[in-house]
């Protein structure tokens, strides 16, 4: 194998640049050239290619976002569009592709594999919702951003004796909400994987107030409902106002944590090894502190499951 390509797809996450860097440097170590595909699958179809070398990836490991830009490309589901992408790759002499992204990105990569083009996947999503791996690139940074934000919100909540609802990302997965809730000492956490009980939420707030607590923090993943919707339900139930803070896209940005940089470096390097070994249609992941790989369809054919033990602990500690 003499030339491979790398692209980032879907939502950007901190650590993608570290993964791109690792792909380029690992490939260079083995004498393999790397081409970067700009703007994800859209760039693959439109031929937005650029040569990457050691200089191209110098000084990017600490940067958030993605050096290659990212975009969503719904039309890539079409056979003719996929075939155009493969033709562009082959015309450029590219023999394998590393795709960094979430389950949707993996589906696109697997479509290429089914059409005979070698591709492997690297998990990059702040939601930490790719089945088969315990952690994804970007989750740790996003989690730290959320916890830091909640700490600051709690400062003002304490000063003004207010209750706050903090809405975080997580359309189908509640890992950010759950982990942040435990780390920030939230009174209540609502995640998509578990049913919520409004009476229980109110009871928890009342128990805190009964022992003299003047403020509280409720975290809700966007996939459950919006923070404003929850505030309305609580007011209808109790007559009390709760402030709402929607963290939004701040969760995607920022310099990646050391953990995300290391994880991304391990994942990117292992992806190159898979291509060199002729192991296509594989996804990189980590389990029990070991970098592993597994069949890519497992990453999008199974549903993400929340850590039940963490959820139970969260409820026990927020009595």
From Swiss-Prot:
GO terms for biological process: canonical glycolysis; fructose 1,6-bisphosphate metabolic process; fructose 6-phosphate metabolic process. The keyword Lipid metabolism does not apply. The keyword DNA repair does not apply. Its main location: cytoplasm. It is an enzyme of class 2 (transferase). Pathway: Carbohydrate degradation; glycolysis; D-glyceraldehyde 3-phosphate and glycerone phosphate from D-glucose: step 3/4. Its EC number is 2.7.1.11. The active site is at 127 (proton acceptor). Substrate binds at residues 125-127, 169-171, 222, 243, 249-252. ADP binds at residues 21-25, 154, 185-187, 211, 213-215. GO terms for cellular component: 6-phosphofructokinase complex. It holds the Pfam family PFK. Keywords: Allosteric enzyme, ATP-binding, Cytoplasm, Glycolysis, Kinase, Magnesium, Metal-binding, Nucleotide-binding, Transferase. Homotetramer. Belongs to the phosphofructokinase type A (PFKA) family. ATP-dependent PFK group I subfamily. Prokaryotic clade 'B1' sub-subfamily. PANTHER family: ATP-DEPENDENT 6-PHOSPHOFRUCTOKINASE, PHOSPHOFRUCTOKINASE. Catalyzes the phosphorylation of D-fructose 6-phosphate to fructose 1,6-bisphosphate by ATP, the first committing step of glycolysis. This is ATP-dependent 6-phosphofructokinase. It comes from Lysinibacillus sphaericus (Bacillus sphaericus).
